[in-house]
């Protein structure tokens, strides 16, 4: 019996020693010095956001100064049964991260506001595994095909083009915002560029995020790349939402210069201020019959006017027998973006000048009569 009491006292002493060691470890972890490196997401103290279920007016910016973070570690000695049950519960309640947007393609007219709305499928902050996430929103412009001449013209107009390249871009790629959520569920974001151009908001309760692009111009034609990352900055899911900037043609005109009788007719159809390039289709009619246009030698049909979109010129050459009246030349223009279609047309009749015909009459070597027809 004495030996049993000794062994019991020894066992208790051992458990007390273990408890003291664990308590000391917990105390030391709770008092980390300021020079200890921690994960970059946890080194900020995000501004709290009220979860009222209403879209926020804005997401607060991250603090300008780095604040120290206190880390507390809970120590427990779980049994095998409790560990298995907790893992099963975590696996059953775990959500696969995803980004679901209301649409993948948004058409916005020039000078209007474009809006994107997405649902963030993430676990609540109580889940330690996914309590931290990062959301990066990057704008990528859509390139358009052009010959070298048009690329240079685009550069002069203020677009981003590479000399010698066959492509031009509205502008370079740009990180719009970087949003973080800390383990407590609070959000913070880096300041958005371009002043009030972009507006980013987060609904903490509904796990939704939105992007607004104000006063859209042709440089905003591209796609937003939304990447959801874990707390180690590893990408979990990526979504592309295209913003199609568009503008219907402002005017359509046909110019048909005068010609001499027997010379070919020439006409040019000018479609001004539309967007994007390639959204306009031109067809010709001669007295109601289809005629084939002639491209310029360098293949270019359009050019940019800074801040006003693109202008297209299509040229056609028609035969002239000199025996018929001048034809009615019509230009039919169809502008299309997505499900939106707009048509217009213009007509011109070229003026024909005839060569003068002169008759002379001679009698006894002298000019008697002359007239011109």
Curated annotation (Swiss-Prot):
Bias (Polar residues): 59-68
Signal peptide residues on this chain, from the entry's feature table: 1-25
Name of this chain's protein: Envelope glycoprotein C homolog
Residues in Ig-like domain copies: 249-347
Family under the similarity heading: Belongs to the herpesviridae glycoprotein C family.
Species for this entry: Meleagrid herpesvirus 1 (strain FC126) (MeHV-1)
Organism lineage string: Viruses, Duplodnaviria, Heunggongvirae, Peploviricota, Herviviricetes
Compositional bias per record (Low complexity), positions renumbered to this chain: 69-80
PROSITE patterns per UniProt: IG_LIKE (PS50835)
Glycosylation site residues: 91, 111, 203, 345
SUPFAM superfamilies documented for this protein: Immunoglobulin
Family matches, as InterPro entries: Ig-like_dom, Ig-like_dom_sf, Ig-like_fold, Marek_A
Region of interest (Disordered), ranges: 58-93
Keywords: Glycoprotein, Host-virus interaction, Immunoglobulin domain, Signal
């Amino acid at each position: 019996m004495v030996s049993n009491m000794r062994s019991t006292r020894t066992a208790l002493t051992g458990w007390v020693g273990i408890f003291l060691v664990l308590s000391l470890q917990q105390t030391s972890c709770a008092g980390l010095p300021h020079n200890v490196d921690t994960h970059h997401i946890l080194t900020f103290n995000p501004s709290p956001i009220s979860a009222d279920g209403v879209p926020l007016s804005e997401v607060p910016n991250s603090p300008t100064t780095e604040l120290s973070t206190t880390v507390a570690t809970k120590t427990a000695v779980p049994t095998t049964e409790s560990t298995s049950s907790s893992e099963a519960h975590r696996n059953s309640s775990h959500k696969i991260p995803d980004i679901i947007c209301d649409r993948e393609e948004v058409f916005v007219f020039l000078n209007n506001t474009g809006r994107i709305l997405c649902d963030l499928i993430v676990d609540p902050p109580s889940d330690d595994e996914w309590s931290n996430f990062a959301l990066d929103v990057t704008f990528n412009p859509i390139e358009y095909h052009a010959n070298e001449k048009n690329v240079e013209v685009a550069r002069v107009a203020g677009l981003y083009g590479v000399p010698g390249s066959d492509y031009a871009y509205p502008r370079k790629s740009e990180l719009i915002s970087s949003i973080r959520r800390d383990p407590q569920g609070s959000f913070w974001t880096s300041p958005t560029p371009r002043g009030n151009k972009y507006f980013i908001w987060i609904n903490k309760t509904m796990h939704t995020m939105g992007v607004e692009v104000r006063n859209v111009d042709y440089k905003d034609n591209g796609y937003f790349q939304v990447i959801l990352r874990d707390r180690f900055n590893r990408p979990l899911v990526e979504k592309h939402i295209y913003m199609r900037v568009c503008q219907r043609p402002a005017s359509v005109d046909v110019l048909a210069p005068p010609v001499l009788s027997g010379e070919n007719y020439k006409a040019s159809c000018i479609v001004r201020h539309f967007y994007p390039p390639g959204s306009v289709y031109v067809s010709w009619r001669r007295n109601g019959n289809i005629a084939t246009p002639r491209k310029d030698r360098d293949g270019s049909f359009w050019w940019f006017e800074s801040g006003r979109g693109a202008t297209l010129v299509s040229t056609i050459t028609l035969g002239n027998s000199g025996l018929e009246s001048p034809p009615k030349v019509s230009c039919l223009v169809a502008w299309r973006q997505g499900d939106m279609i707009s048509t217009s047309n213009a007509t011109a009749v070229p003026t024909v000048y005839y060569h003068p015909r002169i008759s002379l009459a001679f009698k006894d070597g002298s000019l008697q009569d002359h007239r011109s027809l």
